[in-house]
Amino acid sequence: MSKQPHILVSNDDGYLAPGLLALVNAVRPLGRITVIAPEQNHSGASNSLTLSRPLSIHRVAGGERDGFFFVNGTPTDCVHVAMTGFLDEKPDLVISGINQGENMGEDTLYSGTVAAAVEGVMFGVPGIAFSQIDRGWNRIEDAAKAAHDVVAQMLVSALARTEGTATLLNVNIPNRPYADLYRWRVTRLGNRHHSQPVVVQDSPRGEKIYWIGAAGEVKEGSEGTDFHAIAEGCISITPMQLDLTHHARLAAMRANGWDRG
């Protein structure tokens, strides 16, 4: 890119999340940065938009997050308002994360982290979602350095200038020192078994309450999948698309007379 690229950064863990701050600091040398993130944690929000109430946007003044914007909405809300009026012009790249925990296989359908990158692609802007394979933040700076390398590669790649549908990448980073994060694998999504059963408890009022169970174990994690790459200690980079059409089944249904009239 001839001009300094404009990078929009969001997440689903909220604007105070350590993963967001680490990502922003890591990519600052790569371009002009705008941060618009949710006010609260919206993990599992997927591509939900807030339509039942107005949204408000506030700017952080002072501290290490000075200049960050936060929205009382979802990750998708954040990128949507940025693209449809809050920003004077569309950014060159949308990045999201770094998420606290992996987003692999079917996780991507539920993930607010992935959804923020997806929303950028909906507006023709390449998007990258970053997640770290850990529920803690003990190696978040290492993951951020690796994310910097992926963003730098994207900015000089033909993928960033592809005509037509913008590129969408889902990146999962092992919980390892940066020196060990030099191996990248381009992968496909693996597959999990169904989630664990809901956890049933009694509320103080004697009512049954239900907690969503833990993610299922890996069902299909063969070579070439995101699960396999992570198990091998590699960064997993999965190109994704918005078109959910099952094209082979579409052709089969047409061939078998499903078209009528």
Swiss-Prot record:
**Subcellular location, record wording:** Cytoplasm
Q: Which domain of life is it from?
A: Bacteria
- Which cofactors does the annotated protein need, by name? a divalent metal cation
Reactions catalysed: a ribonucleoside 5'-phosphate + H2O = a ribonucleoside + phosphate
- InterPro entries according to UniProt: SurE, SurE-like_Pase/nucleotidase, SurE-like_sf
Q: Which residues bind a divalent metal cation?
A: D12, D13, S43, N99
* Pfam families associated with the record: SurE (PF01975)
EC id: 3.1.3.5
The answer to whether the entry has keyword S-adenosyl-L-methionine is no
Q: How is the cofactor bound?
A: Binds 1 divalent metal cation per subunit.
Q: Please provide the record's keywords in A-Z order.
A: Cytoplasm, Hydrolase, Metal-binding, Nucleotide-binding
Its predominant location is cytoplasm
According to its record, what are the GO cellular component terms? cytoplasm
SS bonds (residue pairs): none
Q: Which GO terms describe its molecular function?
A: 3'-nucleotidase activity; 5'-nucleotidase activity; exopolyphosphatase activity; metal ion binding; nucleotide binding
Q: Coiled-coil region(s) at which residues?
A: none
So what does this one do? Nucleotidase that shows phosphatase activity on nucleoside 5'-monophosphates.
Q: Could you say which protein family the record assigns here?
A: Belongs to the SurE nucleotidase family.
Q: Which NCBIfam families match?
A: PRK00346.1-3, PRK00346.1-4, surE
Q: What is this protein called?
A: 5'-nucleotidase SurE
What organism does the UniProt record list as the source? Polynucleobacter asymbioticus (strain DSM 18221 / CIP 109841 / QLW-P1DMWA-1)
Q: Which gene encodes it?
A: surE
